[in-house]
């Protein structure tokens, strides 16, 4: 995957800019590549927006680390693309960066850096508005469909955060917290030595890393998808490695523990979540029952077919799908295909005119009785 490569190379580049040995940069980046995109066969919007948001975090901390204006230019552009991919967790991580940026510029005012950030923002806004204009998309439709309705969904999702139990927030994600422990120790130690460290670039960098981690944990608790944020372990371990070498040079066994933590967690989650397709709810499915997907269509050649609907008899599901596809193919009228089998239109090489990407309750589209249902219905009628 090109995007997995970009995310991996961004991790490598960022760690390398912190003067971590190239071999370790490669090591941690490789583990990120294993845990990131492979967690789902087809990455969801949650994946894409999360990885873009973390790249934006890299951009922010590199802006502080290198003092280069170019990173302030790209920061709003990356965040903008991430937000248009999916609103959350981009929104939460964006607020963290805005908060830290305000602190940074209060104590390190630099008109040149601010100007570069404004230019990047204006370029993104201009391109965005141009796309709306070319696509004849009213700004009001964008606000209703992409901002207001998702916010109404988010109101219900906030309930998923509670109760705020130690088990749910810390024990469930204990390896993520362990990988960031050195960062937390460094921050507390330096603040105790001198409270002015709170405005230091290094503290802002550590805060950005830990803050974005908690934002991802909160996001993970609010969504109904499988866990996918364990790619943060090698990233946090890599930065822990950087700051451990800087402040604790005498006890090298901690470095070995970080490496062991990264390898063991990658092996565990790679097997339990990626190999077993836990994200797709296939962890209890016997893959020996899977059939060659090209039986359904040659475009699926090279893939194996099995789902949670027919785990013991995938052939029956394929036969039903073939029957349905033949009926749809013989109907020459313009039609809307309402189905969770989103690849049908690809097989038929036709547009399905579906009003929704997903057909799930509560979160995919406004249902009857929802305050935005009339807007949703009138859009298509």
Language-model features: locations:
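Specific aromatic-rich, kink-prone transmembrane helix
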Residues: 10-13, 49-66, 71-79, 98-104, ...
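Extracytoplasmic
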Residues: 88-89, 136, 266-381
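Perimembrane helix-loop-helix junctions
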Residues: 92-123, 244-247
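Membrane-interface alpha helices of multi-pass inner-membrane proteins
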Residues: 33-37, 71-89, 93-98, 123, ...
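Short acidic/glycine- and proline-prone juxtamembrane loop motifs at membrane-interface regions
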Residues: 41-49
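Membrane-interface transmembrane helices that cradle and orient dolichyl/undecaprenyl
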Residues: 16-22, 56-72, 82, 108, ...
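Hydrophobic alpha-helical membrane-interfacial segments at the cytosolic entry of transmembrane helices
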Residues: 109-133, 207, 252-265
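Transmembrane-helix signature of polytopic, membrane-embedded enzymes
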Residues: 5-37, 69-70
